[in-house]
Amino acid sequence: MTYVLIPGAGGDPRYWDLLVDELHARGHKAVAVPLPAADPDAALPEYADAVRAVVDTHPEVVLVAQSLGAFTAPLVAAHPAVRLLVLLNPMIPAPGETPGDWWTATGHAEARAAYAAAQGRDPHAGVDLAVDFFHDVPADVAARLIDGPQESDAVFVHPNPLRRWPDVPTRVISGRDDRFFPADFQRRLAVDRLGVHPHELPGGHLLALSQPRLLAETLLNLTG
């Protein structure tokens, strides 16, 4: 079994480096896919092509998708090699929904503001990478990745070709300390859109950086 890892916004495969090391140490194959996120002409079909090219080279695959990667993963999950789809702190799409429409459709802004207020943080503050994403990531790791590649607008505005969720077992893993996609918000979305309850781990939005060992163990438990 090979774990094929789809990054979130920015398409940076380095996000998965620590998890890849943990999976390799346990005797498992893992491949992180670079996405053409900076290409202004690349959107979900091109992202799916990049992932599919990797999946094509492995007989049995677990697809693992971080955040925005949850829009790409279901476009590839019908591939005959895919045995399981795992979504990590995901933007779970509805069929045909674009990533740009997802924010309003899911009530994300309200959920994020409510969680910030409950924690004593400013509910009206703009997105801050250090506060919202890297707050629980070791400083040396954050220093390497916080200024990673940017995402072009194309993926947010171009059509989403997904017409139905693929007939592949799907699991959701969420960080119970995620400040960007709060755990309550993720629970609601996973149940409403997939009919599944997330496996919750301690940690924020970037679990592969803050909890790589625990995440590796969780993935292995999910895949038997």
Positions of the model-derived regions?
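Conserved serine/cysteine hydrolase catalytic core
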Residues: 151-213, 217
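Conserved alpha/beta-hydrolase catalytic His-Asp/Glu region
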Residues: 119-164
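Short beta-to-alpha linker loops that shape the active-site pocket of alpha/beta-hydrolase fold enzymes
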Residues: 34-38, 91, 204
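Active-site loop/oxyanion-hole signature of alpha/beta-hydrolase fold enzymes
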Residues: 29-62, 100-108
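Glycine-rich His-Gly loop
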Residues: 6-9, 67, 90, 175
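Conserved HGGG/HGGXW glycine-rich cap/lid loop of the alpha/beta-hydrolase fold
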Residues: 1-40
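Flexible "cap/lid" loop of the alpha/beta hydrolase fold
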Residues: 78-119, 153-160, 182
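Gly/Ala-rich beta-loop-alpha elbow adjacent to hydrolase catalytic centers
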Residues: 64-69, 73
